[in-house]
Amino acid sequence: NQYYSGDKDDLSFPKPQQLLIKTIIKTGVPFVTVVTAGSALDLSLLDIKSNAILQAWYPGARGGKTIAEILFGKVNPSGKLPITIYKSLEGMPEFTDYSMKDRTYRFMENEALYPFGFGLSYGDIDLIEAAVEGEAFFPKDESDKFTIKAKIVNRGTQASDEVVQVYLKVVDDANEIPNPRLVAFKRVHLEASEEKEVDIEVSGKAFTTVNDDGVRGLFGSKAEAHVGFGQPNELTKRLLGKNNIALFF
């Protein structure tokens, strides 16, 4: 941030770093951006001009070696964003507004720059199929459990990890939040050309919502789940070039 300490006033890079970015862009030379930061920054210009962006967070004393191994292809990156990268602060609620409207991937109405759960790798892993083992029904109790079986294949030439994610929304519950929410996930390692079936457990509690009295319960009767490598929205589909598979309860 502009003061190099404390809370940020905005999502911009410090002024000297903004100047560095613009100077590099002017050279016309292809470049990769490594972002070492503990929170979201404005990456809108880099999204257009940088050939790739590696979000390194705060990697520690040996982070430089790990970053170099990723950049030179010795390590295949497979991380997923645990936050949302917004396009800008424009349209965001005021800091003094404590409602959840437009905050986090669960309540956002506008499109993000990079969505929660998104991340690329050097691999090429596809989701072939996904289905609920046994009968798919809306749970009657929080203790009910479902197993989703997902079949994935590595079409690439090197070993790779992928994170299979399950998002869910109760479609006939007025208490439900606007967007599907992450309820389960599993990281999977595949060798080149390997095909693997993954079991992901979803509990009945994932179908619960909280009403206006603050009571959590099973208030709906129909739900839709989405299995894939990211959120079930158009932005993630464009960025990954892959579709999710919908399941119905």
Labelled PLM ranges:
Residues 1-249:
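C-terminal non-catalytic regions of proteins with extracellular/luminal or membrane-system context
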